[in-house]
Swiss-Prot record:
One of its GO terms (molecular function) is DNA binding. Transmembrane segments: none annotated. This is Integration host factor subunit beta. It comes from Brucella anthropi (strain ATCC 49188 / DSM 6882 / CCUG 24695 / JCM 21032 / LMG 3331 / NBRC 15819 / NCTC 12168 / Alc 37) (Ochrobactrum anthropi). GO terms for biological process: DNA recombination; regulation of DNA-templated transcription; regulation of translation. Keywords: DNA recombination, DNA-binding, Transcription, Transcription regulation, Translation regulation.
Amino acid sequence: MIKSELVQIIASRNPHLFQRDVENIVGAVFDEITNALAEGNRVELRGFGAFSVKNRPARSGRNPRTGETVDVEEKWVPFFKTGKELRDRLNGAV
């Protein structure tokens, strides 16, 4: 599912909302999650999961095409840990 499909599903299940309003709401939610992560904060959605950022330290890598050793810089990457309710639902427990 892509963002536009998510918007369409939410709009169809909530006929009292205009699709453009749903687009704005979904966009605002994603923007706030992104902003919080960019500030180094954790975003927890109870029952669904938690978004956080993890540090990947600098390391030596290898160019697969040439075999040349390259230095890979330190970077921060997004991380998502599923919540118990989501895991249970995916595994048929609910």
